[in-house]
């Protein structure tokens, strides 16, 4: 077995400097008789293979900043689920001394001590991470052990409510439902065997088995990654900043493809619509109440009238949904898409049990027969998505339903919620593959949808997955949260933790899902206000309390209606953040510590976040709040609602609150684009564009961008079929200069010219003239809302408004 218990040798420190003790001074130990020793090495095209007295170890650089380390490389192992291209490797430089090997990809370097065997990792000359006793095999588990540095903060582990810094915690690596959670949970639906360090590295335990992560809980300076079985590999990624770290990480684990634009619109959802009549009435209610709507989501009643006994039917209950194809076609004409829930379980009482058995689609018991077991919904089995037969059978069902008009898919219970340990899948038993089940399900469905509709982006919402599942378009949510203030308060932490490790579209059941005897009106309003400024706007909950805003009282509707419409007006901003996520992995929701990477205290903040490039959002998560303390980073900020200017040295701002809005700040130098509100994204147009610029002398140079395409084509970026509007503002003592340009080949339906209004906030009254590409226009001093001038200045609001047409040509606007 692999085992090493030893300190670092003096020779190592002489060769590679004295930075190693910054990990903390390891206790010097005698070399253990089971220690691993180097025997020889071979540099191959696929990496460096080191032979030791206990087997082979393979090191592969996946990029200049990412390395995969596979122990027991000479034995048969499960494939990597985390890596987007597990077989690829880049060439790296190898140097050797008598006692050490140095293997470098560029940004990241592995330094290998031969006797006893040990690997340490450097970013340039800075020690990032070192194995303590490397890889170990015990009778009941395998594990890796690494040193933690003094003061090092650790994020990660996926969905947990433990505080942002997870150091000092030990928790299971086993996806499991936590029904009705509130403000604490150590084990939830979607865990991740990965961490992000304040030293700006990400470490992934590329193992799908049941296990645990111990982040300095048992031993304060030791990180231990454990699993019952499975792949003995880890991936280390380095960066020079948090954004570059995320970019490097998603380069090797895969980037989230752009979702369809409609995924960013308004959803109607509950548990659940029990009939076609109720579903139609809900869509009509949105129209009657003048609320935008893009999607209606059908929970499990679409295939059976009861919660129990029907799972696995995977076909319409014609008694309660007599004309589902007509229903979906009617919705489509109104710009409303239909999303159906599916689960991976097939009950013995369902219509498809015999067919699934005949098709060999189900996982097996140890005797090779279809495994049946008890779950909440009845007795049944689980589809083996790891087998060709199971994938083929499940895919054919999705194909048939998609042909009928289903526009997107909701995959529920994919932890899996029930997964007996003696269940046998095609590639391993339940405990070995458990955490990769949702990942493989998403991969299968994503490929099936692209094969069937190569010109459309799939919509796949799932409750569980693995590191890298984002590359299959997975849109996860945070599960069955309780209808409590604690449930709402936990959502920022959950979203940020998942977003940092690739899942930019993580979101919650707005309003809460579980329990609650009656509606808490204030909490509901606050949750749906928060929802406007997070990735997916989807109210959802048990149906004894209506989830949808259209079924609330008049005051609630009056508060929420303009906010939902605002989200539609802000779609260019939200969609551009989605584009950035696809391009670089940058999350849509971003933590405050991105603003000051040298301030580790910001890592602990879980009350506020950046929404896209320019907005700082602070949800209200307590009842009766009259003012909120906002940890605004140093600089100039503007109140999004009132336009008030604030300057802070980094001390928190205290803002009064009311029931109509939550605190949102805009950073100085921000460009905020808007389009006219529509009732569905099918009517989305950007031929009329409003751009708000928040001017301030503290920002002499500002840049922004707006990404536009057809909202559907999965290859729009690859084919350059988009319109990227770039914006730059240069501020001097007596002039403000804007440069506007467009790049990209364009897309079907793209406006050649846009009627553009540029609104400059905090504008000086010194400007008298506007030059547009050399043509001079006098600036009128008037109320811009009632003055049809091409350029006007509103003294009371301190806003300057410019109206012009923006075609394909670049524009230079100069205020003087």
Curated annotation (Swiss-Prot):
The gene is agd31B. InterPro entries: DUF5110, Gal_mutarotase_sf_dom, Glyco_hydro_31_C, Glyco_hydro_31_N_dom, Glyco_hydro_31_TIM, Glyco_hydro_b, Glycoside_hydrolase_SF. Residues 1-24 form the signal peptide. It catalyses: Transfers the non-reducing terminal alpha-D-glucose residue from a (1->4)-alpha-D-glucan to the 4-position of a free glucose or of a glucosyl residue at the non-reducing terminus of a (1->4)-alpha-D-glucan, thus bringing about the rearrangement of oligosaccharides. Keywords: Glycosyltransferase, Signal, Transferase. The active site is at 412 (nucleophile), 415, 480 (proton donor). GO terms for molecular function: carbohydrate binding; hydrolase activity, hydrolyzing O-glycosyl compounds; oligosaccharide 4-alpha-D-glucosyltransferase activity. Pfam families: DUF5110, Gal_mutarotas_2, Glyco_hydro_31_2nd, Glyco_hydro_31_3rd. Belongs to the glycosyl hydrolase 31 family. Disulfide bonds: none annotated. Its EC number is 2.4.1.161. One of its GO terms (biological process) is carbohydrate metabolic process. The keyword Transit peptide does not apply. It is an enzyme of class 2 (transferase). Acarbose binds at residues 299, 417, 463, 480, 540. This is Oligosaccharide 4-alpha-D-glucosyltransferase. Alpha-transglucosylase that specifically transfers single glucosyl units from alpha(1->4)-glucans to the non-reducing terminal 4-OH of glucose and alpha(1->4)- and alpha(1->6)-linked glucosyl residues. Acts on amylose, amylopectin, glycogen and maltooligosaccharides, with the highest activity with maltotriose as a donor, and also accepts maltose. Does not act as a hydrolase: weak hydrolysis activity is only observed on the disaccharide maltose. It comes from Cellvibrio japonicus (strain Ueda107). Gene3D superfamilies: Glycosidases (3.20.20.80), glycosyl hydrolase (family 31) (2.60.40.1760), Golgi alpha-mannosidase II (2.60.40.1180).
